[in-house]
């Protein structure tokens, strides 16, 4: 089965092909560098760029896979969550292809796709704890099976990747901030003991909060006392400490020794090192090229949904800016084609 995967939930236009016999023969990602000058993503600009990039990216994805549209068996696309104007750009393109080619339209949840990007290169046993860390999300999810999810907690304010971007902007490092801070932190030491938000809060043991940490870091930046590399190291130590300890706590309480880390921040070298150093914990990370938003994870997850659940949806199914992953399977059934 050959599935076309479309991802436009934020500022990356990505289209990929998943072939059940060949794997991922193509995965084209066009990043919108125009946002770097603003230090963040502007939705209206993102939507315009998606519309401009869609056909060239589609053409390259097909050429890289050495196929034509007639070889496609189904169209998978990210329907939710994300920037609504960005999502609509991809969903509109997917619906047009589905209608004109008379092929099934398979909906994919953005968080779900990040999690199952880990499955593209290896099989992972259920159940497992998923830690999703990206520019828009910080969530802990118990995955019992595909489409059987228990949402444990998420961020109460800023997502971890968003805070990385804002701290990087305050330091004058550029955008996106995650890789830049990760690189600079390797040269620094922990000169400041920043707060570990909600780390010992029983009522919020699976929730996250990074706005206070962000403010504390920016205050220290504005004082101009410490070196940039020491600030980034101190900041990253606090972030990684919170992410790892809350995940390990959930593993202990649910009796699970398997963790899947997903999302753009899963590329962080210190986060990987801290998790992989934990004894008796099986931790999985996606390949580096599948950490950030990409069409391959959408194509594969769409294939998995169609193969295991037989799910496709009618053209009436609409994109949504918000939808928790545990609510998504039930929502699908009301629009099952």
Curated annotation (Swiss-Prot):
One matching Pfam family is: TsaD
Q: Which UniProt keywords apply?
A: Acyltransferase, Cytoplasm, Iron, Metal-binding, Transferase, tRNA processing
Where does the protein end up? Cytoplasm
GO process annotations (BP): tRNA threonylcarbamoyladenosine modification
- Give cofactor(s), names only: Fe(2+)
The main enzyme category here is transferase
**Protein name, entry field:** tRNA N6-adenosine threonylcarbamoyltransferase
Q: Which organism is it from?
A: Sulfurihydrogenibium sp. (strain YO3AOP1)
